[in-house]
Amino acid sequence: MLTVVTSTLHLYREALHATSRSLVRGWLAIPAVIVFTLLMLLAHQIARPLGMLGGFLLGAVNACLIGAILSLIEQAIKGMRAITLGDVIESMGHYFWDVRSVGCVLWIPTLRLDTSLRANPDSQFLVTACLLLVFILLNPAPEVIYLTRHDSPLDVLKRSYDFVLDNWIEWFLPMALVLAPLGLSLFFKLSSQLGRGAGLDFIQLVFVPFTVLSAWLTDFGISAELTGMIALLLTPPLMVGMLIFRGHLFVALSATSRRQRLYQSQFHDSAR
């Protein structure tokens, strides 16, 4: 049991060290997140009176921005040089069809869930359970898109599912440690929102670190006004750091099995 704990801690320590190095290279992704968020909010204002056409517009803008941020995170993780303004501009359009196609696959079942909820408000528990299941099984979909070779949106979903089955403890433990003190209600709120798009909704990606950080600051007794200011200021770097950490953790978990990590941990401890 001690060996399991040691190997897991070593895994997270290495991922955190790699994250810090990637943040130095990819710090420009932080102001990019701010600009992308403003663009997404502008798109919402433009799309609001356009009905169904506005929905298609929002989907396209979301796919463009999600693909761009995933491209920047990929460069921060894999690259050997600092990200430049040119990289930010060139990132627009990357992974557009990957994000759009996965979103289309999930759109119909999500629409049916919403229709069911409107027709029968008592089905709230069933809808929440379904979205929780999607949130869990498709949680690594963003990392699958930019860190693996895949043939189709269904392949992305299958690879996400397989990854979670193999690595669910190590993958979800950091999230559990962060959210556990804040209560189950916040967890179910976040899972219901993220489950709708498999983590590929840009506004939700911004919303998660903002909400979690706000909850932590509130628990520490900080006033609502100061909490809002601090959360707004720290959300972009927290979002980028979270995505980079997830990417490094995904790479580490995909490259080795749990048994291999246990063996490597024993070798690492004996070498110290």
Regions found by a protein language model. Give the residues of each.
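Hydrophobic alpha-helical membrane segments
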Residues: 1-272
